[in-house]
Amino acid sequence: MAEGKGFLRLEWARDHMPVIAEIRKRFLDEKPFKGINIAMALHVEAKTGIFSLLLKEGGANVRMASCNPLSSDDSVVESLKTDYGMPVFARKGETQEEYYENLQRTLEKPPDIIIDDGGDLTKLVHTERKDLSKNIMGGNEETTTGVVRLKAMEKAGVLLFPMFDVNDANMKHLFDNRYGTGQSTLDGIMNSTNLLIAGRNVVVAGYGYCGRGIAMRLKGMGANVIVTEIDPIKANEAIMDGFQVRRMNDAIRYADMVITATGMKDVVKYEDALVAKKNIVLANAGHFDNEVAVKEIEKHSLEKREVREFVKRYRLENGNTVDVIADGRLVNLAAGQGHPVEIMDLSFALQALTAEYLVKNHQNLEKKVYPVPPEIDRYVAEIRLKQFGGELDTLTEDQIKYLNSWDEGT
């Protein structure tokens, strides 16, 4: 194989994904996906590439598209196709039409399993390609946004096969959402702006695990962080973690930067942009491009121009100017390299083992959203802990007896 840029990026990722490496040993021997067709819509970059190769090495026929028009690494796409013979349908900067055409192409070989990030592929096989659903065992969903859509489908009674919520596994959301999103979001912002974080007023919209990860990293780099929330419990958490909590339309007046991480649309409205500080930086860490109302901002703008790679400046009707990174799309992948390799090692290990569980147990599953089995969550945690060099205490027989008793007190 020619050692091109994409090939080297894949090899680098493989070298730093020890949990996947451990699982790979067994998959190579047992071939748990032999004869299984898997359609995937994920961010097509190096870590995802190693995950897709793991499934292929486990016997699967994998077809992959991107789950976001701006998140693909073209060098990795080329290497997967050329060096590994994998059908991959993606490029960075897809048009909306290309994006949906590529999703369709993953379905040209009818899938037994789908692995999705954000829910667009799942929606496709529940609408335009509903004819394929009868042969689908089930699937996995990677991210918060997609899980919200899945649960809405389940509630409406339209879910046609079982889906696993990988996002809410402990070894996913406690690490990927918090440490992964926190680091990679700032990586994307700093890569695209070259601006200082220390001393800046930064608004973080949303204090779920993604938002708190971003806020934690900003605080560590010296930013003054203001949080916006709709949930009083999370707002109280933010305050006790040392952050101010304000309404967006108030906070944005003092902010040098706003980062959204909510999974909700119109978090930063056009009305907010009008009262923002001049040249405020607007970035989105959520899955879709509607958290910052970019279309509304563009509609009412007098001028739009690209001021840096990935950054567009809009001059608004009142003369104010705002800088939007990556058209309001997922900043860590559109303007950066995505989550750290070791973080995605955990998430994709969960994905692989849950897909294996689905193959073995799909006949006993209903048309509903399932959590990742706790034994899989714990297994991934144990492998990673061992690789960190960590060791666990074990309970004595007397402690186990105490744990299960009710009559011992003070």
Curated annotation (Swiss-Prot):
**Which UniProt keywords are listed?**
Cytoplasm, Hydrolase, NAD, One-carbon metabolism
Q: Which residues bind substrate?
A: 117, 142, 172, 176
Q: Which InterPro entries match?
A: Adenosylhomocyst_ase-like_sf, Adenosylhomocysteinase-like, Ado_hCys_hydrolase_NAD-bd, NAD(P)-bd_dom_sf, S-Ado-L-homoCys_hydrolase_CS
Instruction: Tell me how the cofactor is bound.
Output: Binds 1 NAD(+) per subunit.
Q: Give any single GO term for biological process.
A: S-adenosylmethionine cycle
Task: List the GO terms this entry assigns under cellular component, sorted alphabetically.
Answer: cytosol
Q: Name one GO molecular function term.
A: adenosylhomocysteinase activity
Which reaction does this chain catalyze?
S-adenosyl-L-homocysteine + H2O = L-homocysteine + adenosine
Which HAMAP family does the UniProt entry name for this protein? Answer: AdoHcyase
Say what the protein does. May play a key role in the regulation of the intracellular concentration of adenosylhomocysteine.
Q: What is this protein called?
A: Adenosylhomocysteinase
Source organism of this protein record: Thermoplasma volcanium (strain ATCC 51530 / DSM 4299 / JCM 9571 / NBRC 15438 / GSS1)
